[in-house]
Amino acid sequence: QQQYVCTATLIDWASRAPSSAQRHTRYQTVGRFAEHVHLEEPRHELPPPNHFGQRKTRRVPRIYTALEIDHLVLAAAQLSAGDPRRPQTYATLISLLAATGLRISEALHLRYGDVTPDGLLIRKTKFQKSRLVPLHETAAAGLGQYLAQRRPMPLATDHVFIDDNGQPIGYGTVYRIFARLARAAEIPTLRGHRPRLHELRHTFAVRALQAAPAGRQRIGQHM
């Protein structure tokens, strides 16, 4: 067992990380620690900066306020033109994304059989795994009201969310509608960037962590 920070050992350990982001995190974290302890004990080696190259800076995500989410849902409920089902469809979709942290792809792939008394069964997620996402009683009630009107429709698809033509909603349609909702809700740009749909997922994650100590367990179930 090594007593001092060793650059070669750090590089080997960081290289074993499952992703490039985690590799950089491991390397930079130990590197900062080494800078601190090296002042008192020079036998701690100082790893060279950016050994794995300069990490690409990610855009800082927007965290929506509760009021902004309310305004998005209200704007959805007031959608006009097209299918008269559109307002309830998008109000329910936005509410569900905000309440569960689902990816938009996961929400759009939901089928009747995925809505269970225990929550939403998310099949073959981004990492090809399935998980059960619990629903708060208010979210379950809202989804139930939507399904009460959706199920009787004599359509060929059993997807939960459908477009004006009775087909599963496409990504492009959702993003166009969301941009429209964000403008109607008067949500401002942030650091030059317009509001994004995926930031509802970031918002859910942050709110869940703020609800500690139960937050970490809750976010794990949803993500």
Regions from the PLM with identified roles:
Residues 1-223:
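Conserved catalytic core of the tyrosine transesterase superfamily
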